Amino acid sequence: MLRSILFYPGVILSLIISPIALIRIKYLEIRGKDKERTNAIFKITHSWAKYVMWLSGAKINVHGRENIIRDEAVLFVSNHQSYFDIPLIMSTIDVPQGFIAKKELEKWPIISMWMKYIHCVFMDRENIRKSAEAIVQGIQILKSGYSMFIFPEGTRSKGKSTASFKAGSFKLALKSKVKIIPVTINGSYKLLDANGGKIKASDVEVCIHEPIDVTKLSKEEISELHSTVRDIIVSKLPKDQQ
């Protein structure tokens, strides 16, 4: 209970004061310093995510950092356990990246502003046309040299078995010809989703797997790509969550 009392006001206060950082970002925009602007946005959002995870009491263990590609855009693909997954990933994978996120997040004040700054794309999964438009937008971002992150289950598992991955999500990598880096999240649901809205400190593991070069896959391998990536990711989960 005490952690929840500290967590929610702490996050809200950090969001309220965060627009102050826009002064530097706007200055860099005016000066046309796009690279410096991108780096500044990343540092701000990365630091905020680390603060959120610190407030949560999460003890994070990261495996496979050596598999992170830093000199080209990639598509990170992960299972989805909790509302904490986005700040968890932002705090542990230290390269600029946008997220394919559910449309509801676009309505969240301040948070949606920062999500747009890091090139997040908001997807309406219940509307086929708008979902396709979101994928096209994500492909364009990847082609521009900026990495993206997607949860192809389309919903949170909350510690239950991992749902099947939607094949359409992988068009992001196939159409932009970027590598895929599978990521396993294990235990994030214990921070919130398993506690009825209360924050509880817990151990969380993030496993970053070896990249997959989609340009070297056969047609058969491409048709099974969503299942292959899912198998890689769930291999690091407890059996009852696979």
Residues of each region from the PLM?
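Short, basic, glycine/proline-bearing loop/turn elements
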Residues: A49, C120-D124, G154-T155
